[in-house]
Amino acid sequence: MQVDWGEAVIYLGGQRMAVNPFCARLCFSCAPFVIAYERQNLESFLDALTRAIQFFGGVPRQVIFDNARVAVKSGFGAHAVAQEDYAQFAAHYGFEPVFCNPASGNEKGLVENLVGYIRRNVCVPLPRVRSLEELNAKLLEQCAKYQTHRVDNKPASVGEMLTEERQALHAIPRYTLDTSKKFYPTVGRYATVIVETNQYSVPCGYRGQSTTVKAYPNHIEIWLSLIHI
């Protein structure tokens, strides 16, 4: 499976804003998966991979990506060292992370073509949506529609070949890995916790207590031991 980030501009609730479509494409069937996020951060990257695996119905043997900092700790290409969270994710799902060499777009040409396809077919003219969920529903609809397409030099439609390709995918683990980014702030005197540059209010009775904050792409959860605040 090849994966990559794109960039797009939309109107969200009447306001013009930039979003980041995550694109994934299987190599045999050319089946696409696309989901948009506000940011290209680690939480979004791992959440998108989880959703792509679920959408395709199995785990590919390899995930081919570039040398973006969300995935690579050091080095590049064959010498790249994966970020700890990404390495843990790959181990959980049982795939090999493969990193492209610099300036070698041909190594993930399938997904780069998908980025362009989404830009031309979904983002022109600029989409007007009320929420990111509405945009992602449109993206999934486009992915489903593409399965009726037949790629040049392929013997069958994308959907038919995806059915065949699923037989070669690994089974999805029964346990879904928690891909949130963790923080461990103490509740301050004003009953707030600080996560990066943001403050979040909690009930006054939790002042001085240690919490676990789980940051997901579009929301956070604050936990005190096993209690979800």
Predicted feature locations:
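Conserved small/polar residues in nucleotide/adenosyl-binding loops
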Residues: 227-229
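Two-metal-ion acidic nuclease core segments, chiefly of the RNase H-like superfamily
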Residues: 79-97
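RNase H-like two-metal-ion nuclease catalytic core shared by retroviral integrases
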Residues: 65, 76-77, 97-119, 135
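Mobile-element integrase/transposase regions
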Residues: 1-32, 40-44, 178-195
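Active-site beta-loop-alpha junctions of metal-dependent nucleic acid enzymes
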Residues: 34-62, 83
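Active-site-proximal acidic segments at structured loop/helix or strand boundaries
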Residues: 115-214
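Acidic/histidine-rich, metal-coordinating catalytic segments
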Residues: 59-78
